[in-house]
Amino acid sequence: MNLIFLGPPGAGKGTYAKRVVEKYIIPHISTGDIFREAIAKGTELGRKVQDIVNSGNLVPDELTNALVEERLKQDDCKKGFILDGYPRTLNQAQALNEMLKKMGKELDGAIYFEVDEETVVQRISTRRVCSKCGKVYNVITLPSKVEGICDDCGGTLIQRDDDKEDIVRSRYRVYIEKTSPLIEYYKNQNKLFTLDGRKSVEEVMKILFNILGGFEKK
């Protein structure tokens, strides 16, 4: 089962991916993880990524595509995978099609967790993180027992700069602008499945598992 997860920050992709991984025993792959792994291993591609990251530039499509292809050839991807954060561009989407074709595979579906701007702002701007242990809270949906204090270690809960409202709005708008062509691309290929990411995790998972059940019957 070969999947792409699409959705703005705060859509819950990580939560849904975790549940799918547990059920289907397939890896959840993000480009960030791929970059970190390549750098840690000190491979030739990893060294190139390290140089680019150190210089403050974005990793070009060609290098990202090569690293993704290398990752998808690993044994744990034989039964399938979830790609998160890739593809980000039409160029990358076309490259993914080509690399899967070479491997004798195809994409089963691009799952788009659609969430409006106000919901994303509410979810992320109410997030708090322990400055000591990194545990994540939410002042509305997952508050600590004592306001501003971590339940586990007693550390101070802080709001990360990335979680502040103006930054969240900017990130959301950039994501929608960049992702719109991808949504159309996968819609035209009849690969797009749009889920209402405003619903509860359980409601979304029920619909998602129904979709994935259809892929299993192929």
Swiss-Prot record:
Associated pathway: Purine metabolism; AMP biosynthesis via salvage pathway; AMP from ADP: step 1/1
Residue segments, region NMP: 30-59
EC number(s) stated in the UniProt entry for this protein: 2.7.4.3
Binding residue positions for Zn(2+): 130, 133, 150, 153
Role this protein plays: Catalyzes the reversible transfer of the terminal phosphate group between ATP and AMP. Plays an important role in cellular energy homeostasis and in adenine nucleotide metabolism.
Residues that, per the record, bind AMP: 31, 36, 57-59, 85-88, 92, 160, 171
CDD domains xrefs: ADK
Free-text note regarding domains: Consists of three domains, a large central CORE domain and two small peripheral domains, NMPbind and LID, which undergo movements during catalysis. The LID domain closes over the site of phosphoryl transfer upon ATP binding. Assembling and dissambling the active center during each catalytic cycle provides an effective means to prevent ATP hydrolysis. Some bacteria have evolved a zinc-coordinating structure that stabilizes the LID domain.
Binding-site residues, ATP: 10-15, 127, 136-137, 199
UniProt keyword terms in alphabetical order: ATP-binding, Cytoplasm, Kinase, Metal-binding, Nucleotide biosynthesis, Nucleotide-binding, Transferase, Zinc
Organism: Fervidobacterium nodosum (strain ATCC 35602 / DSM 5306 / Rt17-B1)
Subunit-level organization: Monomer.
InterPro entries, A to Z: Adenyl_kin_sub, Adenylat/UMP-CMP_kin, Adenylat_kinase_CS, Adenylate_kinase_lid-dom, P-loop_NTPase
Protein name: Adenylate kinase
Catalyzed reaction equations: AMP + ATP = 2 ADP
GO-annotated biological processes: AMP salvage
Cellular location(s): Cytoplasm
A Pfam family matched in the record: ADK
PROSITE patterns per the UniProt record, alphabetical: ADENYLATE_KINASE
UniProt similarity note: Belongs to the adenylate kinase family.
GO molecular function term, any single one: zinc ion binding
Top EC class, one word: transferase
Annotated stretches, region: LID: 126-163
This protein's GO CC annotations: cytoplasm
